[in-house]
């Protein structure tokens, strides 16, 4: 039987922490062991050099905000004012803490450009979903930091043109290649495990959102009244374009059939009306190789926006937020914290409210991951 709020059937496995991961645990601040957070507030960690570390099955990236020695810096003032990221593990219906299958990525000042930044949320699912999402953090960290075409760029506009060229060819290829590289990982079985990818790339005044799955990014702007702009579209099996593709591949989209003969829960992708596998509640995913032949693909959708003076902030989050909170609910919670320039407080309150909603439903709670970016 499937849980209504899970993207797939999961037999959770706790990954082992290797020696290198254990060695750096002593540098971590004392925080709630069930909440993973990175101090991405620009008021903190200014003197640290950039580094990454692991804790509680998570990858963190802390960035140095010091601009000294940045010869390629084309802006004296950064466009992004403040940002913060936090992830909280879900709970079983018995109240036990689950393995957090979410991961997130924050890379700032890539290639020494003050306004070349990447923010991404990866929501893993399946028996080894946590390993898939962690792999994607490592893969995209390497891609953005070491890609030779990016390194050749001497100005931010060149980076943007590189990404925009031929309908986002470089980014499109990078995301598809991530799935191919995932298949090569001997320690990860991705047949029935995968991850979403909701990625925001900021280059100067331009925003590119690349999305696979149902993690979501929204942009809030304000002229006369507050306006919510979807930077990504959820990839759900019952949505027209997704449904047509899945049927073309021979897949079946149905709600889960329970023992009492009732179809219930979200629409899922199945191999047949017998509902043998994979039972995915999303129609695009990185991984889930057994579902590829059913039309569940890693093909990203892109959205392009220009940052304007009336734009206030961006929220990127896994469906642990969106399951019970609407876009409007989220903006109402964040509003007071935006006025105080408190991205950390905004995320903590957002996760608190989402957790309360999950508890009210009396079900197991999903992992929750949020990135907030203030302009």
Identify the residue ranges that each predicted region occupies:
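PP2C/PPM-type serine/threonine phosphatase catalytic domain
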Residues: 1-375
């Amino acid at each position: 039987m499937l849980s209504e709020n899970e993207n797939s059937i999961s037999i959770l496995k706790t990954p082992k922490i290797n020696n290198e991961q254990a060695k750096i645990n002593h540098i971590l601040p004392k925080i709630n062991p069930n909440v993973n957070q990175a101090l991405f507030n620009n008021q903190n960690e200014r003197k640290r050099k950039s580094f990454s570390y692991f804790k509680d099955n998570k990858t963190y990236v802390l960035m140095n905000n010091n601009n000294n020695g940045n010869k390629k810096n084309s802006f004296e003032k950064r466009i992004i004012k403040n940002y913060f990221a936090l992830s909280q593990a879900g709970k079983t219906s018995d109240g036990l803490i689950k393995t957090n299958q979410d991961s997130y990525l924050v890379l700032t000042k890539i290639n020494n450009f003050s306004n070349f930044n990447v923010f991404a949320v990866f929501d893993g699912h399946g028996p080894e979903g946590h390993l898939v999402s962690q792999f994607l953090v490592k893969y995209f960290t390497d891609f953005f930091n070491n890609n030779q075409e990016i390194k050749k760029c001497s100005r931010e506009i060149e980076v943007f043109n590189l990404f925009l060229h031929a309908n986002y060819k470089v980014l499109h290829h990078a995301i598809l290649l991530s799935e191919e590289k995932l298949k090569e990982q001997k320690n990860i079985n991705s047949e029935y495990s995968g991850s979403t990818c909701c990625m925001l790339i900021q280059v100067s005044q331009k925003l590119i959102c690349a999305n696979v799955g149902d993690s979501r990014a929204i942009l809030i702007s304000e002229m006369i009244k507050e306006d919510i702009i979807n930077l990504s579209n959820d990839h759900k099996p019952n949505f027209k374009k997704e449904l047509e593709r899945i049927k073309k591949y021979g897949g079946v989209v149905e709600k889960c059939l329970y023992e009492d003969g009732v179809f219930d829960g979200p629409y899922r992708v199945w191999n047949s009306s017998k509902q043998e596998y994979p039972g995915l509640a999303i129609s695009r995913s990185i991984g889930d190789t057994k579902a590829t032949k059913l039309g569940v693909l890693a093909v990203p959708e892109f959205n392009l926006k220009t940052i304007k003076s009336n734009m206030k902030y961006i929220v990127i989050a896994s469906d642990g937020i969106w399951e019970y909170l609407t876009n409007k609910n989220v903006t109402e919670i964040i509003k007071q914290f935006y006025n105080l320039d408190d991205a950390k407080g905004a995320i903590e309150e957002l996760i608190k409210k989402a957790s309360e909603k999950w508890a009210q439903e009396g079900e197991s709670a999903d992992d929750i991951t949020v990135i907030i970016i203030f302009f």
